[in-house]
Amino acid sequence: GVLMFGIFLSTMLILNEGAKGMWKIMIPVILGFVVMSATVWAYWGDLDSSETPKYIVPITTVIYIAAYFLLRAEDEVDDGLSEFRMGLNIEDKPSLVAMLLVVVMGIWYSFMSVVMPGDRIEAFGLGEASPEMLDAGLGAPSEVTVAVSGSLFLVYTIWTAMVVLDGPKGKWPVLH
């Protein structure tokens, strides 16, 4: 919920500030939503409650992609994209090391959660959950839950990588 709330806030920023130059928010969200759509379909199981997310996630993804393409013409959402140059563009070395560490950990977490959610669940070693544990909400998450969290975390990882690669200047919507 918290990860999705952050994406909601980024969308509210676009609505409040205007879409000019907000490719730095929208492209990572699109990538995360595409991965989420794939993981929802790949890992959906019999224990997952409703079939609705299997259809809503891809529909939401298509709507978000359509909004991006509509904003390209109207509000110059791609403003600044052509000036994006990859490189390590943070001058403060301790900050650069910290951000690189966050990016590496984010890539690892996202990759493991999306590609091998079952292994991530087994890594906690919960074993078999008793009915009392399940009633208390202490059971293991489903594979789709772990994979979706990895796809949401991917958005934040890409945002952080963009700050490292392009520098922090003008990235206040991403950093907040």
Language-model segment annotations:
Residues 1-16, 31-32, 104, 140-165:
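Core segments of alpha-helical transmembrane spans in multipass integral membrane proteins
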Residues 14-24, 132-143, 165-174:
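Short juxtamembrane and helix-loop transition motifs at transmembrane-helix boundaries
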Residues 25-41, 175-176:
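Hydrophobic alpha-helical membrane segments
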Residues 38-55:
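Membrane-helix boundary connector in multi-pass membrane proteins
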Residues 43, 61-80:
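Membrane-water interface at the C-terminal end of transmembrane alpha helices
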Residues 77-108:
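Cytosolic juxtamembrane helix and N-cap/initiation of the first transmembrane helix
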Residues 105-125:
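Transmembrane alpha-helix/helix-exit interface in multi-pass inner-membrane proteins
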Residues 119-138:
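Membrane-interface interhelical connector segments
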